[in-house]
């Protein structure tokens, strides 16, 4: 079956569908959180656990993917995971209180976590020729973009017109189609015999990633390590990671196979997928809030801007396979450079920017991400042995997810902390003794002799301080893209052939 082109195309379509439905579940729920909060009589802090626990379950289950595939095979694991994902998705839509929803969201994350790494491993094993593999990665990458891009808009419409429950119901037809595709077209892989699961390593790593994810997700809300709970989680994180590290060094059967990291391109690929995770998701978190709250864009304009970013990614996926034939490192460098330029330009935004200007910056940023992803996927797995592919793709996506989580948390910290500094500095300038405030233009904007004028000036100072905070985060974003470029020289252009 794997030797003929037509079945391989079907495999690619099925795996793209599997990937899209899981990634849609990650983004579609966000738009319905306010409505869910009211319907389930939850506080903002309580409803935030709907997202947090799903991310924790995903982080814990992802490293287990390789062992699951080795023990039961990719077909069985896919069937179980897609089935479990479909059932928990349906159950999420039927709850009447918060507690069962949290339980089902944990199940949704745990069943969904292996889907993306297994899908990538199946495609990589089906398309072994470098040129065809590049095209396949491009097509699969489009499912990563199109699904999560459409889902929030469709989910928001369904939640507004009907109920928040429809954000889960709309996933069911797609997940059932994915299950039928897996049952009909995915065959068993020839993976090596599984060794006994290293429970010490798995439990230690699970505790570490759980603590880390909760710290990242709730740290800013709880004032980081000033909070006793966050401090305790940090201590547990360090201890459990130390235990995992020592177990990996001295165990005869470590949970994460050390052979993975003897592959030079794979190890470098992990570094660059961390960078990709940093750069790909962060703008979709920062831009909507900034544009809506401090520039005054309506939801429709923000949706258009995000759609244009998806267009840029789509164009990158079209171009990257051709450029990668010349040298994948050049394509990656061009992608990082485009992302860096978009960050530099974003750092010039102000409250008067037009939708057109922000849109073309989004296209450039999306183009860079598209140019980076395909060659990154190619060089990372070019020499990895087939029996390590499931472990490799699982670790690959775990690192990508943590790149996103860490950089988002860092950028939010930069925005909030520098906004306070900016507010203090601007407030010092805006005082009755500043001669600039006595000029005619200033008097027209802010009448300091009235309470309304003082309130208006204070609000303007706050808005400008936060805006400068966002600009600082865009500078950090640009540096995150440009600084790693020289390290691309360490990647082998034509690595030796891998051995099974």
What are these regions (language model features)?
Residues 138, 160-272, 276-279, 305, ...:
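Hydrophobic transmembrane-helix bundles of small-molecule transporters
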Residues 44, 74, 98, 130, ...:
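Membrane-helix interface/capping residues of multi-pass secondary transporters
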Residues 8-24, 29-33, 40, 44-53, ...:
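12-transmembrane solute porter fold
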Residues 122, 126, 157, 185, ...:
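A residue-level signal for alpha-helical anchor/packing sites in multi-pass solute transporters
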Residues 62-200:
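Helix-loop-helix hairpins in multi-pass membrane proteins, especially solute transporters
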Residues 12, 48, 74-79, 101-102, ...:
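Hydrophobic/aromatic positions within or immediately flanking transmembrane alpha-helices
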Residues 395, 399-493, 499-500:
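Hydrophobic transmembrane architecture of multi-pass small-molecule transporters
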Residues 56-60, 90, 145, 149, ...:
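Hydrophobic/small/kink-forming positions within alpha-helical transmembrane segments
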């Amino acid at each position: 079956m794997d030797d003929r082109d037509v079945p391989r195309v079907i495999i690619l379509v099925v795996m793209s569908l599997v990937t899209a439905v899981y990634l849609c579940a990650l983004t579609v729920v966000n738009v319905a959180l306010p409505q869910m909060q009211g319907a389930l009589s939850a506080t903002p802090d309580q409803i935030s656990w709907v997202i947090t626990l799903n991310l924790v379950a995903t982080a814990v289950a992802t490293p287990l993917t390789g062992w699951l595939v080795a023990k039961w095979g990719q077909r069985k694991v896919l069937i179980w995971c897609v089935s479990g994902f479909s059932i928990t998705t349906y159950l999420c839509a039927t709850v009447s209180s918060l507690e069962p929803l949290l339980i089902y969201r944990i199940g949704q994350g745990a069943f969904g976590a292996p889907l993306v790494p297994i899908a990538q491993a199946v495609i990589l094993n089906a398309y072994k020729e470098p040129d065809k593999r590049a095209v396949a990665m491009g097509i699969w990458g489009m499912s990563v973009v199109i699904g999560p891009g459409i889902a929030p808009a469709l989910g928001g419409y369904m939640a507004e017109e009907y109920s928040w429950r429809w954000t889960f119901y709309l996933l069911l037809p797609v997940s059932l189609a994915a299950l039928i595709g897996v049952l009909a077209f995915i065959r068993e892989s020839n993976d090596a015999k599984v060794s006994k699961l290293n429970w010490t390593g798995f439990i230690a790593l699970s505790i570490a990633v759980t603590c880390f994810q909760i710290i990242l997700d709730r740290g800013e809300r709880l004032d980081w390590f000033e909070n006793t709970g966050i401090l305790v989680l940090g201590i547990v994180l360090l201890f459990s990671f130390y235990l995992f590290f020592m177990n990996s060094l001295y165990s005869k059967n470590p949970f994460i196979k050390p052979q993975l990291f003897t592959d030079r391109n794979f190890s470098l690929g992990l570094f660059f997928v961390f960078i990709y995770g940093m750069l790909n998701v962060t703008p979709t978190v920062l831009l909507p809030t900034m544009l809506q709250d401090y520039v005054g864009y309506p939801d429709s304009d923000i949706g258009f801007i995000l759609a244009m970013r998806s267009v840029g990614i789509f164009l990158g996926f079209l171009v990257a396979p051709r450029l990668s034939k010349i040298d994948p490192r050049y394509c990656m460098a061009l992608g990082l450079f485009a992302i860096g330029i978009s960050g530099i330009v974003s750092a010039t935004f102000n409250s008067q920017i037009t939708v057109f200007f922000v849109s073309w910056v989004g296209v450039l940023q999306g183009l860079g991400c598209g140019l980076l992803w395909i060659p990154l996927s190619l060089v990372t797995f070019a020499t990895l042995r087939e029996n390590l592919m499931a472990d490799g793709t699982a670790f690959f996506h775990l690192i990508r997810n943590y790149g996103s989580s860490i950089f988002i948390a860092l950028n939010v910290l930069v925005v909030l902390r520098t906004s306070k500094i900016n507010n203090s500095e601007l407030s010092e300038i805006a005082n009755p003794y500043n001669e600039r405030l006595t000029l005619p233009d200033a008097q027209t904007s802010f009448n300091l002799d009235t309470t309304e004028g003082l309130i208006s000036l204070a609000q303007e100072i706050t808005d400008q301080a936060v805006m400068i905070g966002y600009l600082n985060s865009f500078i950090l974003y640009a540096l995150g893209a440009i600084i790693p470029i020289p390290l691309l020289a360490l990647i082998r252009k034509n690595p030796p052939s891998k051995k099974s």
